[in-house]
Each structure stands twice: as C-alpha cells, then as structure tokens.
C-alpha cells in the first residue's frame, strides 16, 4: 500500500471516529422523537396494541409499561395528551435502562445521529447494505453482514409473539450498534435477555421505523 493511500485511509478512519464523538452515540438514537422506541410507542397508541411497545423492554418491565398505557386509555382531553407523553417517556426510560443507559428526556425530532446509524436503518429498510458502504471499517464489515442478516431474518414476525418481537429488537440493536462501531455490541442478549435472540424488530421493532 502506498504512503498516500495509507494516509487517505487513516484520515478517513479518523473522520469517522470524530463523527461518532461529535454526534450522539448510537445507543442514544433510541431516545429521540425520530427513534425506533418512540415510533413503536406511537404505533401502540394508534393501534391500541401495547405489544408494539413491550417488544422494546424486558419482561420484568412489562407491568410498568402496561400501567402507563392503561392511563392513556383512561385519560380525556388534556389529561390524555399528558398520559400519552408519560407513556412514551416511560417506554424510552425502561428501554434505556435495559441497555444500562441513563435517561434525561426524549430528544427532539431532527437530533443529529452518526451517519452509520442512519445508513444502517436505511440498509435494513431497503434490504441492501449499500448505504453502509464507506462508513464501516473493512475489519468490521463481515460482522455487519452477519448482524444485518440476523436483523433482516427476524424483522417480520407475529406482533402477538413477544419473545419473537424481542428477539427482533435485540438483533436490530446489535446490528445498528455494531455498524456504528460500538464493540461487539452483544446488546441483544444484554438488552432483552429474556428474548435471547438478540433483539429487535422490525415489524415494529424496527426501527426502520426506527431508528
């Protein structure tokens, strides 16, 4: 490899690393208005099916999510609006806690995300890894390919099957985090341990929605 090519690759890698530091970490895209967790929560509110939301939290946290969801149904007028918001905040907070992350409120729509996170969602939506070309280091590419395959295989599932939905979410989270450069990102198990599947979506879990 020529010195010029080596320098070019080094600069490119450095720019990608800087982008990850300047923009918010991949795990944070789950606490934005545009992210997959809020989108799943809104699907639950619109459809009346709380399972869309439950896929994003541990089984141990289901009761708290169900209680917040029930409060929405019981609310009227302004009370309903407030209950909607509390439900979404409860959902995101518990999802974040399941990943060992803190929660300081849902970030506004349009909050910048690392390019690899946006591209990972786009790749899953289109069924092609092309959007991620040039955003992932060569030594991590095979790992991305494997995680993409797992997330793609699990994204279509019966919404009534929570273990399957949580497996999809786990696979999704693992894929996106890894694509963004976060370690081996075995979040799936860590996040939705009960699902043992690695974690999310898609269907709803997607985050395609997501993201």
Regions found by a protein language model. Give the residues of each.
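Extended amphipathic alpha-helical interaction segments
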Residues: 88-161, 165, 169-189
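N-terminal Sec/ER secretory leader and immediately downstream segment
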Residues: 25-88
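Non-membrane alpha-helical secondary structure
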Residues: 3, 7, 33, 57, ...
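Repeat-mediated protein-protein interaction surfaces in helical alpha-solenoids
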Residues: 18-25, 46-49, 96-104
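Long, intrinsically disordered low-complexity tandem-repeat segments
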Residues: 185-210
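General secondary-structure edge motif
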Residues: 21-24, 33, 112, 155-156
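Long, charge-rich, low-complexity intrinsically disordered regions
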Residues: 3-28
């Amino acid at each position: 490899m020529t010195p010029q090519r080596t320098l070019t690759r080094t600069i490119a890698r450095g720019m990608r690393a800087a982008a990850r530091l300047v923009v918010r970490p991949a795990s944070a895209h789950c606490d934005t208005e545009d992210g997959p967790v809020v989108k799943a929560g809104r699907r639950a509110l619109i459809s009346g099916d709380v399972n869309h939301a439950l896929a994003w939290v541990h089984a141990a946290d289901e009761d708290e999510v169900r209680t917040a969801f029930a409060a929405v149904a019981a609310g009227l007028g302004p009370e309903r609006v407030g209950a909607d918001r509390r439900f979404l905040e409860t959902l995101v907070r518990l999802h974040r806690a399941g990943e060992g992350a803190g929660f300081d409120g849902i970030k506004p729509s349009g909050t910048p995300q690392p390019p690899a996170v946006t591209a990972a969602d786009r790749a899953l939506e289109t069924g092609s890894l092309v959007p991620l070309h040039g955003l992932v280091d060569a030594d991590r590419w095979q790992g991305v390919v494997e995680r993409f395959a797992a997330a793609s295989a699990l994204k279509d599932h019966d919404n009534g099957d929570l273990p399957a939905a949580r497996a999809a979410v786990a696979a999704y989270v693992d894929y996106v985090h890894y694509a963004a450069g976060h370690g081996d990102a075995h979040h799936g198990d860590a996040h939705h341990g009960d699902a043992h599947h690695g974690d999310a979506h898609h269907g709803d879990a997607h985050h395609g929605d997501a993201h």
